[in-house]
A protein has these predicted regions:
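Catalytic cores of carbohydrate-active enzymes
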Residues: 244, 363, 370-373, 414-523, ...
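Glycine-rich, acidic and aromatic/proline-enriched surface loops and short helix-turn segments
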Residues: 248-256, 300-308, 572-579
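Inter-helical turn/loop segments and adjacent helix faces that build the functional surface
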Residues: 223, 338-350, 419-436, 490, ...
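Carboxylate/His-rich catalytic cores and anion/metal-binding grooves
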Residues: 215-251, 280-285, 290-300, 489-502
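Carbohydrate-binding/catalytic loop surfaces
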Residues: 256, 260-273, 311-330, 334, ...
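Non-catalytic C-terminal accessory modules of carbohydrate-active enzymes
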Residues: 46-76, 83-87, 497-507, 512-520, ...
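Terminal accessory carbohydrate-recognition/targeting modules of carbohydrate-active enzymes
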Residues: 1-238, 242, 269, 291, ...
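Aromatic-rich carbohydrate-recognition surfaces in CAZymes
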Residues: 109-110, 131-134, 143, 205-207, ...
């Protein structure tokens, strides 16, 4: 579950909502139950509505944003409203691991008797759809402790709306028609809906008094709401510097199911838990902020999913796209990072069996789309269906049809073989160690023969029956950044220099060089236009993490100041796009606007991991 909106509380996306929850009884999507809660200040019979909605015809109502005097989110989002002599503070916090939003209203100042009125706007719809006025929606509600519960449609959970203070609920059902979401308009989607308001809550408030509102799929003890809110605020990391913003963002990707399984969400607001994203982001989101325990919890769930896949059993975990051919390779990389943090002995004890099983599974050629060829390289078919992280499709076909020998797959494979060979030696499994070393040697030799070209960079993918792909893409950086590289030091430096000249931006690496054909750096416009641009020049911060790791590997401390300057581009982003986090991607040309999902796990993770690497190289 999540809560998401703009700082003036005007929803601009269909994904926005005050309480957005999964409803597994219906489908695998999140659903907006409570779209917004409009507060109205009443004094001497005069009403001042603090809400804000955009309606068709570019009309905004009731324009409550004009009363906002301050906004900050150092710990939790806090808005200060001034209406004449009334000063009202609103603080919002989402209860960790619960489907509950809490809002605390504090009357900071008032010179007359003051009443607050709260009008909830209900949607009860999927984040992928809109709702409109209809006769099917139920208007029934039941009174609960200091509030009500209601449910608009069968199959949905009840929505409990409760306050910490006694109040009067006035049943006055109505539909607010033509609410419009401009960001959906920009993307060429349907953009308006109708929202249902069952009535309003009303209560008096004294100067200095605080009232807590709770919206959830379960009832709460209203006597505990004040303490519950205070406890949640106490647990939050302050956003008082760049690092703390990232730590706070990292925790937002933590996901726990009712079965107590632990996952990493790929991003907000529309991404689920994806296998590749999980393993790439897991080290940065946990190990880089000294949270090894959560790494182990996620890996416990992920390991179960990996074994189910490798053993051909029905998949029971909620980690999607586990069948993608490079997922197993990224799992090895994630465990490799764990070993560097906790020591190889503990890592071997916990994960040696999983590592060996993954390597043996690949060697046995059991992965349906990861075939080990006689030259020691891995081959994947990606012409008809995208199989790498560059997975955008248009008209049913991959925009970037990466197929054959894919550069990062084979860099990861070489790294995995070398890492597991060392592990096998440490465990006394000399025969396995020798086999892994032999395969790594063959893979490394073939890698150089296959991918290195006369211009000093690497082919992105090579289909033996076709000409190699000459596009300059960032995937070659992994062959430099990984602990074990099949390239010579001179070749590594050459690859890094090409990435620096043609791909580096203040927001990460471009997905395609401006000198290559098909360069399209602007991620704007309708869906098809964005699909074609997705991996054709846009900049990705998570790739920048591996670039900076490669820089430190090749140039050591001499590049520290350069990398610190690069990090400024991400620090600036803390007050852009989505406050306190990093979005999915950026335009590949200045001014490098943030685009896509408002918060992306791999980006946050790799920036955190880069900060950690900087500290290690400094000392």
């Amino acid at each position: 579950a999540y809560s998401c909106s703009t700082i003036v509380d005007c929803n601009t996306r269909k994904y926005h909502g005050l309480l957005v929850v999964p409803v597994p009884e219906l489908d695998d999507e999140n659903h907006v139950l409570l779209s917004s809660l409009d507060a109205t200040v009443i004094q001497h019979g005069a009403e001042f509505n603090l809400g804000l909605h955009k309606y068709q015809g570019n009309n905004y109502s009731p324009k409550g944003h004009k009363y906002i005097r301050e906004f900050d989110c150092d710990k939790v989002p806090t808005t200060l409203y001034r209406v004449g002599g009334v000063v009202l503070k609103k603080e919002v916090v989402f209860q960790h691991y619960e489907d509950r939003i809490l809002i605390r209203y504090t009357l900071v100042d008032a010179h007359s008797a003051t009443t607050l009125r709260f009008r909830p706007f209900l949607a009860f719809r999927s984040v992928r759809q809109f709702t409109h006025e209809n006769t099917v929606a139920s208007r029934e509600y039941s009174e609960v402790e200091k509030g009500i519960k209601t449910c608009m449609y069968a199959g949905y959970p009840d929505l409990y709306m409760q306050f910490s203070k006694d109040n009067k609920f006035v049943f006055m059902p109505d539909w607010y028609r033509g609410v419009e979401y401009p960001k959906e308009q920009e993307r060429g989607y349907a953009s308006n809906e109708d929202l249902y308001v069952p009535g309003y809550f009303e209560m008096n408030i004294e100067k200095g008094e605080s009232i807590v509102f709770s919206a959830s799929t379960s009832a709460c003890d209203t006597a505990e709401l004040q303490q519950l809110f205070a406890d949640e605020v106490e647990e939050r990391s302050p956003r008082d510097n760049f690092f703390h913003c990232l730590v706070n963002a990292a925790h937002q990707f933590h996901n726990r199911t009712k079965k107590d399984e632990r996952y990493i969400l790929a991003g907000y607001p529309w991404f689920k838990c994806r296998a590749r994203d999980t393993f790439i982001s897991l080290p940065g989101l946990t190990l880089s902020i000294e949270e090894e325990d959560y790494f182990e919890l996620v890996m416990e769930t992920a390991s179960r999913g990996l074994y189910e896949f490798m053993e051909g059993k029905p998949l029971t975990t909620k980690m999607y796209e586990i069948e993608q051919p490079d997922v197993l390779l990224w799992a090895v990389w994630a465990i490799q990072q764990y070993a560097k943090h906790v020591g190889r002995e503990k890592c071997n004890r916990k994960y040696s069996k999983l590592l060996c099983d993954i390597i043996d599974y690949i060697i046995a050629d059991k992965q349906p789309n990861l075939h080990l060829k006689d030259n020691g390289l891995l081959y994947s078919e990606g012409k008809e269906k995208a199989v790498t992280w560059m997975n955008s499709t248009a008209n049913g076909h991959p925009v970037v049809p990466r197929t054959g020998y894919i550069v990062e797959f084979n860099a990861l494979w070489y790294n995995a073989l070398k890492f597991c060979a060392v592990m096998a030696t440490e465990l006394g499994a000399d025969a396995e160690a020798a086999e892994y070393e032999k395969r790594a040697e063959l893979c490394g030799s073939s890698f150089v023969d296959t991918f290195v070209n006369q211009y000093g960079y690497l082919f992105d993918y090579v289909e033996p029956k076709d000409n190699p792909d000459w596009s300059v893409r960032p995937n070659m950086i992994f062959a430099v950044a990984l602990d074990y590289s099949p390239l010579s030091p001179a070749q590594q430096k050459s690859v890094l220099d090409v990435c620096t000249r043609e791909l580096l931006t203040p927001k990460g690496l471009r997905s395609l060089s401006p000198k290559s054909g098909g360069y399209n750096p602007m991620y704007v416009g309708p869906q098809t236009q964005r699909d074609y641009a997705y991996h054709q020049g846009t900049a990705w911060p998570w790739l920048g993490g591996f670039y900076m790791e490669a820089c430190l590997k090749i140039y050591k401390r001499t590049r520290l100041s350069f990398i610190e300057r690069q990090m400024v581009g991400y620090e600036d982003e803390m007050v852009q796009h989505c406050v306190g986090t990093i979005p999915e991607l950026f335009d590949g040309n200045p001014p490098f606007h943030g685009r896509g999902a408002i918060s992306f796990a791999m980006n946050v993770a790799e920036v955190l991991r880069t900060l950690e690497l900087l500290e290690k190289y400094k000392y």
